[in-house]
């Protein structure tokens, strides 16, 4: 066993992620890309960090904010909607959230929206007055209604929100929307945005001051490198000096061009990191502008 994994429990960083669901696999993949590996326990709820003293807890997504607030975990990857729902609920009871979103992690994008039966003729939020709205996010919805100056009844449901209008338990719903297919299947249409959401890395407001502080800083730096490179490619090519300005204008989403040592063929050797899609059409456009020997390379890791 290495010295790092033999560290006492209080010096080990602990991260909570969803055990199953749409955020589970992307979260594990992101952390693995940061160089983390684990040994899973028999109950499959705890994963002991092997490459670094960073352990995983596999839990329900709605447990993650509370685990951070109570100091059980240092970090968690959770939907921003779940984080805000519990923060809003704590505010209503006069409690501080004790956690915050450290950064977005680039997946799990969705929208919390109001959706009404397809036969409704929607004119605006004034129609919500006196209506019953079913949702799994009562605190977010209540805050939103208050900001809109609308009095409506919030019907809290833990699941199957989309069938509430057909069952007669609500007039409309407030639910997460990704593709909209579930709404369409239940004869509902989205009409009003309540909040945009994505998966975030959440952490305690008070960061650890012991050995975990160094681990946290290292993990965040690695994660920034992974996220920056997720949609990036290294582009290499040769070009005459007179063509460089025109080529640079075709790369607005790229880092400044870096000149490499001359290869003796009279042309400049250049490279840059592109942070957008590098399509065949884009390569052909660069070629027409004077780029030669174009190569697109995947970059796995970077420390900026």
Curated annotation (Swiss-Prot):
Metabolic or biological pathway: Amino-acid biosynthesis; L-histidine biosynthesis; L-histidine from 5-phospho-alpha-D-ribose 1-diphosphate: step 1/9
Keywords carried by this UniProt record: Amino-acid biosynthesis, ATP-binding, Cytoplasm, Glycosyltransferase, Histidine biosynthesis, Magnesium, Metal-binding, Nucleotide-binding, Transferase
CDD domains found in the cross-reference section: PBP2_HisGL2 (cd13592)
GO biological process: L-histidine biosynthetic process
Family membership: Belongs to the ATP phosphoribosyltransferase family. Long subfamily.
GO molecular function: ATP binding; ATP phosphoribosyltransferase activity; magnesium ion binding
Reactions the enzyme catalyzes: 1-(5-phospho-beta-D-ribosyl)-ATP + diphosphate = 5-phospho-alpha-D-ribose 1-diphosphate + ATP
Name listed for the protein in its UniProt record: ATP phosphoribosyltransferase
Pfam families linked to this entry: HisG
Top-level lineage group: Bacteria
Enzyme Commission (EC) number: 2.4.2.17
Function: Catalyzes the condensation of ATP and 5-phosphoribose 1-diphosphate to form N'-(5'-phosphoribosyl)-ATP (PR-ATP). Has a crucial role in the pathway because the rate of histidine biosynthesis seems to be controlled primarily by regulation of HisG enzymatic activity.
Cofactor needs: Mg(2+)
Location(s) in or outside the cell: Cytoplasm
A GO cellular component annotation in the UniProt record: cytoplasm
Regulation: Feedback inhibited by histidine.
């Amino acid at each position: 066993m290495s010295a790092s994994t033999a560290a006492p429990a209080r010096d080990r960083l602990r991260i909570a992620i969803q055990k199953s669901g749409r955020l589970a696999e992307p979260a594990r993949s992101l952390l693995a890309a940061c160089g983390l590996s684990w040994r899973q326990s028999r109950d499959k709820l705890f994963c002991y960090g092997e490459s670094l003293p960073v352990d995983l807890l596999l839990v329900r997504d709605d447990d993650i904010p509370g685990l951070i607030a109570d100091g059980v975990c240092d970090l968690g990857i959770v939907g921003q909607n779940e984080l805000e729902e519990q923060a809003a609920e704590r505010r209503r009871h006069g409690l501080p959230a004790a956690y915050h979103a450290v950064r977005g992690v680039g997946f799990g994008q969705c929208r919390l929206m109001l959706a009404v039966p397809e036969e409704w003729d929607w004119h605006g939020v004034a129609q919500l007055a006196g209506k019953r709205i079913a949702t799994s996010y009562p605190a977010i919805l209540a805050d939103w209604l208050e900001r809109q100056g609308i009095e409506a009844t919030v019907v809290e449901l833990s699941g199957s929100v989309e069938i509430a209008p057909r069952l007669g338990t609500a007039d409309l719903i407030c639910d997460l929307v990704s593709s909209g297919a579930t709404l369409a299947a239940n004869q509902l249409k989205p009409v009003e945005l309540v909040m945009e959401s994505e998966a975030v890395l959440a952490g305690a407001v008070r960061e650890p001051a012991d050995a975990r502080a160094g681990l946290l800083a290292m993990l965040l730096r690695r994660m920034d490198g992974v996220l920056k490179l997720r949609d990036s490619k290294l582009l290499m090519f040769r070009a005459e000096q007179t063509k460089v300005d025109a080529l640079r204008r075709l790369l607005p989403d790229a880092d400044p061009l870096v000149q490499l040592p001359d290869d003796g063929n009279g042309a400049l050797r250049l490279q840059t990191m592109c942070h957008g899609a590098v399509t065949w059409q884009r390569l052909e456009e660069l070629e027409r502008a004077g780029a030669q020997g174009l190569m697109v390379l995947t970059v796995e890791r970077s420390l900026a």
